[in-house]
């Protein structure tokens, strides 16, 4: 057992109002500079829709994530090491700028400098790439906002698989939900596996995935390898960049910028302990519908004395263990089974989870709009948002986990409504979904009236315990045994011998001794 800690996030889609505050603040802090105008580390999509970039969830087109071979092993969908290397100079599956959008501003100066004339001057769009005026804007990061555009285009959404989607093009059957998206900081990141230069790494202390800007060579294979398309190429610097989970804030115990500024208070941050030795086993699960449950088995109970003892023995700080015990992410994902991972079928074991949307249905149910099931709760399967659509997004097509989460949220509402409105304690609904009174009241506190300290439980990092990483700078990415730490082999891709790597630490220590 190799115990590691990860700072995870849960987003409650039941409360997201689509205000884009998270997107704007993230943009202003991290990507408001030349070369990254089109990049949105955090963006809010309206579903159903093809997303950003266009058809980003279609892995048949973009070749992201992992696939399981017949021998039971997984490999990047993009190809093996040799297959990835052959795409270095010509990658046919990397999104182009038109798959995102041509970033633009408006010619505001013309409003002030235009000469006197018959007509009011207008501010025409101007490209932020070449500075030239654009004929018209044809796409954007939130082009499908509030179901913008015709249904025929939005119907290409991959989450409509196994659904008769034609009926949802009719006005009376239409539905909509918001989906904030950011880097998932996966336990099994495919972007790390597809980077030939070894520039992408996952931090052991908090699980945040970062790109070493010194080692990045701009091959852009990580962009193809990421199934969530949350790595962007900076055309100015020639490097790839991605969400850094605001790690300078996380290290000091503060939430990410998107979480801090969220108007709807939908975001929760907390620590999860997991067994790193079980990651490959979980990601290699044969059936895609079982991936969610296998990922849950990777996580460890922070209240288990044996887990605590082993974690301390392996160097996990005490404050991290205590934070894991109070983690809202663990409560929602593991205790209450409300939060689900985004597209577990990609086999990356994502660590940004989502509570499926339920609102607004109470008045609709009271008016008899929802058929009754055998128990107290109405038939969740008859909600306006198709359960199969949510399952395709959050549980690899398995409707069971989605129905369980929705029924538990509905039961919580039924129980709290009976207390506050009717003045009685009706436990029939929560008994039906297998929850206790204590669990439901705690769920209500976290989902409805949580304080700042409840939503964000982030331990400060122990930089004094970090080892000297300087000696690891001479590590490399893809290798055939002839380039890392002085090793050598007969095969060399570039037909030339490589000198042994120089251990800078030894040279420095020797110089200090002299």
Question: Which ranges hold each PLM region?
Answer:
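Non-ligating segments of multi-cofactor redox enzymes
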Residues: 1-514
């Amino acid at each position: 057992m190799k115990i590691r800690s990860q700072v995870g996030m849960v987003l409650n889609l039941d409360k997201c109002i689509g205000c884009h505050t998270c997107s704007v603040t993230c943009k202003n802090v991290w990507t408001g500079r030349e070369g990254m105008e089109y990049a949105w580390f955090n963006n809010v999509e309206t579903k159903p829709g093809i997303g950003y970039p266009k058809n980003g969830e279609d892995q048949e087109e973009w070749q992201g994530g992992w696939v399981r071979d017949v021998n039971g092993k997984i490999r990047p969908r993009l190809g093996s090491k040799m297959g990835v290397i052959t795409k270095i100079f010509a990658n046919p599956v990397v999104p182009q700028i038109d798959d995102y959008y041509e970033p633009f501003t408006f010619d505001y100066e013309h409003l002030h400098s235009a000469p006197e004339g018959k007509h009011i001057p207008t501010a025409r769009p101007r490209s932020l790439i070449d500075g030239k005026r654009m004929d018209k804007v044809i796409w954007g990061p939130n082009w499908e906002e509030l179901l913008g555009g015709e249904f025929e285009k939005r119907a290409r959404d991959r989450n409509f698989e196994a659904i008769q989607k034609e009926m949802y093009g009719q006005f009376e059957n239409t539905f909509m939900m918001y989906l904030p998206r950011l880097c998932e900081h996966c336990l099994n990141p495919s972007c790390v596996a597809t980077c030939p230069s070894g520039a992408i790494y996952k931090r052991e202390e908090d699980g945040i995935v970062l790109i070493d800007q010194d080692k990045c060579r701009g091959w852009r294979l990580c962009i193809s390898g990421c199934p969530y398309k949350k790595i962007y190429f900076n055309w100015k610097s020639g490097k790839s960049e991605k969400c850094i989970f605001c790690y300078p804030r996380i290290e000091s115990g503060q939430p990410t910028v998107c979480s801090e500024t969220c108007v709807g208070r939908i975001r929760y941050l907390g620590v999860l302990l997991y067994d790193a030795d079980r990651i490959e086993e979980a990601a290699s699960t044969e059936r895609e519908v079982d991936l969610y449950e296998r990922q849950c088995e990777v996580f460890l109970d922070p209240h288990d004395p044996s887990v605590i003892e082993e974690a301390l023995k392996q160097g996990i700080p005490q404050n991290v263990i205590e934070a894991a015990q109070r983690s809202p992410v663990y409560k929602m994902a593991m205790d209450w089974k409300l939060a689900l991972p985004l597209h577990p079928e990609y086999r990356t074991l994502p660590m940004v989870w989502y509570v499926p949307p339920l609102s607004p249905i109470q008045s609709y149910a009271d008016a008899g709009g929802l058929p009754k099931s055998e128990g107290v709760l109405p038939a969740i399967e008859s909600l306006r948002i198709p359960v199969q659509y949510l399952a395709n997004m959050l549980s690899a097509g398995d409707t069971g986990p989605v129905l369980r989460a929705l029924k538990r949220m509905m039961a919580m509402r039924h129980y709290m409504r009976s207390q506050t409105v009717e003045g009685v304690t009706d436990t029939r609904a929560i008994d039906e979904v297998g929850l206790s009174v204590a669990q439901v009241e705690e769920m209500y506190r976290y989902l409805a009236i949580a304080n700042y300290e409840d939503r964000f439980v982030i331990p400060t990092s122990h930089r004094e315990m970090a080892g000297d990483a300087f000696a690891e700078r001479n590590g490399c990415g893809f290798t055939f045994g002839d380039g890392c730490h002085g090793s050598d082999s007969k095969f060399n891709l570039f037909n030339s011998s490589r000198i042994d790597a120089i251990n800078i630490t030894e040279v420095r220590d020797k110089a200090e001794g002299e």
